[in-house]
Amino acid sequence: DVPAIKIASFEIIDLPLISYAAAQGRPMIISTGMATVAEIDNAVRAAVSSGAGALALLRCNSGYPAEPGEMDLHSIPAMQAMWNVPVGLSDHSVGPSAASAAVALGAVLVEKHLTLRRANGGPDAAFSLEPDELSEFVSSVREVHSTLGSVRFGPSKREVASVALRRSLRAVKPITQGDLITMENVRSVRPAGGLAPDLIDTVCGMVACRALDQGDPLVWSDLNPAGMR
């Protein structure tokens, strides 16, 4: 009894096999190495119509090992849009770069070959990972996934403290009550705490209604309109 059934790239054109596997009602994963759009579409239709419990596709390059320039990972979001199923990567490349890029493009699962000892040889030894390498690979890919987050703007929790390091309008020399605010006595400097820098044209020509020391933040209560001294 297995939790899911994997159809390798070389079997994607065997529609009777796919239909039989799908009829077992288990989740299915189909690799798409070498396959045309029509061949992938036929495989998806066969799996769905035969009762696959759930279906995912894997973008795959069946070159052993796969060259980075031939992996065409931009196909991943295209496949998601075309067949409306989860898409991952069957990774036959060397190293973690392709898998990390795939995750950044929306891949939801990654298949990687494992060998207990690469020196033992075999047809997939060149791009297989040993156990300690697999652990590092998983950590690397998960770290990339964690950086994706969600679509949001504004300061994050850790950025809130950094807001204080923004610029604001401050006195850059002593200002006496009644002085006009000018570009010479007020400028945009760090830290925050004063009026926003984009208000500099608005405040220039206004009158200080109290004395300000060099470095003091400029706020609305410090100002009167021009002519009110």
PLM segments and residue spans:
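Catalytic cores and adjacent flexible loops of soluble metabolic enzymes
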Residues: 1-229
